[in-house]
Amino acid sequence: MKQLKLNYQIEDVNSLVNNIKDSNIIKKLIENLNITDDEIITHYDLLSSYQLSNEKCQNCRSMKDCKQSTFGMKYCIKRDDQNILTDSFTICNYYKDYYTRKKNIVYTTFNEEDLLDDSQKNFFYDNVNFLGNEFIGKVLSLTKNEKVNGAFVQLNNSKLRLRLMQSLSYKLLLNHQVSIIKFSDFLKTVKSEFKISDGTSSLQEVINSEILIIDGIGNESITSWSRDEILLSILDNRIQMEKTTFICSEYSLEQLKKLYKLSYND
């Protein structure tokens, strides 16, 4: 990139150099690139722009805090092939993680931005004990790249249950491809797809996901179709393919067995 030129008269060289060196943001840059006092004079505008831009990043803790005009981009200075200082832009670490997670969402019935919100991280660790030791153990095994079939957890608090499943997806999305669905909403989507096509698009995405998180089973309008053609189809196929499935419901396994035991006329 073209070198920026000093656009005002230098009256006090020492003052100019010290002004730049006083900045904690610039100090680290000077140290990393071995920037000389002469280079500070020559590239004063460049360094000032760097300082102003990176001050916006000082208190940033997530993508929600980003104040850059170009979302997720960080202003940088480096040396080119001729060892001359030049500016460029790079993706910040927060955006790298954000982009990775976004790319790894296979299918969801939820707002993607809710799943990508960095507040999910702290929520998961603050409330993880609600999931129980067995469920937590399966999640930890996944983070160690161990084979996990899945786990079930019963949580009566619907808001807590939903938030925990979303925060679980946030944790897993950094290294895994994940689908997360509220089952009743997913059924509505599949039904609408059947009206315009064979209805298998969303169903296959969910079945083939590396990890699937299902929230709220038992809360849908249960029919033989929703049970046999959708829910059991998803679970049976995923078991055969040895895919990981996490299920969360307000009902216990015994209660779910009774709910899904339909009359023979269905």
Model regions and ranges:
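Charged, amphipathic alpha-helical linker segments immediately N-terminal to NTP-binding catalytic cores
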Residues: 78-135
